[in-house]
Amino acid sequence: MQAPLTVVTLDSGETKDLKDFYNGKPLILVFLRHFGCIFCREQIAELRQFKTENIVLVCMGRVQETSDFKKKMEIPQTMISDPNKLLYEAFSLRRGSFGQVINPTLTRKSIKLLKGGHKLGILKGDPWMLAGVFRIEPDGDVSYSHYATDVSDNLSGAAIAQLLKLK
């Protein structure tokens, strides 16, 4: 699979070719669910350690919402605002079924995160959309793809670190 040749809008409002992010070095592209997703907030907390790595986060918020969320969550990475889910669609990310979004196991996982200090936020975006992570090589080849199997299926910081080390 090749990364799409497309222009994206950043949290700053600036537009940029997606290929500019992987030109010369691999890119880890992380697609988040909605801003209130406790599992995404857990993943963001783990991604904060990678301040200098080439990681870009994609969300469904409008530019100002994305910028505000980035500040509130202290996200060091660049964020792409994709309220129409065009980039989600280009990477074949899909909406989850009822069982992938709501079930007893996910409820228990959410409670555990709440007890651990993570917080739910306001729902902004499609609550049924599942997340994903992709590694894009400098030639545009997508060498790794992770499609979430449910709303809690996000790559850990350790898994992201391994992706960064791939040659």
Give the role of each language-model region.
Residues M1-D20, E42:
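N-terminal "domain-start" segment that seeds a small globular fold
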Residues D82-S152:
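Thiol/selenol-based redox catalytic cores and closely related redox-interacting motifs
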